[in-house]
């Protein structure tokens, strides 16, 4: 009996004009997620997804490449305007933001939503090199 050919499911094209870009930049990686106003994910990318391994993931260039990839996927869904929420202490924050602006998005607002403790958990010990 012949095996039935599996059908390739094509992702349906949503028509969303505005959304929110969540840029999470850690010391080791940069993750960018573009959502609609309700928080449903439209596209996402990270420096690790772009093929960067190890310490190269934490570079501004890797964050720029991830932002360009994420922006390209969001433009396919018809997105034009973005609010940007930046989180974390990493080095890829500004370069990811610049890459989103260069991709043709109109950035309406930039918010820093990095969580700041009011003397919460004890921080990790200082690194001595």
Curated annotation (Swiss-Prot):
Alphabetical list of Gene3D superfamilies matching this protein: Ribosomal protein S11 (3.30.420.80)
CC per GO annotation: ribonucleoprotein complex; ribosome
Matching InterPro entries: Ribosomal_uS11 (IPR001971), Ribosomal_uS11_bac-type (IPR019981), Ribosomal_uS11_CS (IPR018102), Ribosomal_uS11_sf (IPR036967)
Keywords from the named record: Ribonucleoprotein, Ribosomal protein, RNA-binding, rRNA-binding
Family: Belongs to the universal ribosomal protein uS11 family.
PANTHER family found in the cross-reference section: 40S RIBOSOMAL PROTEIN S14/30S RIBOSOMAL PROTEIN S11 (PTHR11759)
Name listed for the protein in its UniProt record: Small ribosomal subunit protein uS11
Gene that produces this protein: rpsK
């Amino acid at each position: 009996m012949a095996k039935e050919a599996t059908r390739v499911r094509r992702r349906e094209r949503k028509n969303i004009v505005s959304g929110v870009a969540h840029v999470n930049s850690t010391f080791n990686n940069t993750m960018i997620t573009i959502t609609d106003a309700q928080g449903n994910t439209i596209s996402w990318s990270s420096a690790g997804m772009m093929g960067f391994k190890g310490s190269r993931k934490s570079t501004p260039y890797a964050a720029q490449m991830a932002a360009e990839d994420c922006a390209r996927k969001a433009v396919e869904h018809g997105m034009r305007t973005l609010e940007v929420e930046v989180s974390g202490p990493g080095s890829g924050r500004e370069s990811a933001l610049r890459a989103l602006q260069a991709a043709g998005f109109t950035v309406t607002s930039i918010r820093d939503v990095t969580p700041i403790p009011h003397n919460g958990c004890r921080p990790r010990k200082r690194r001595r090199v």
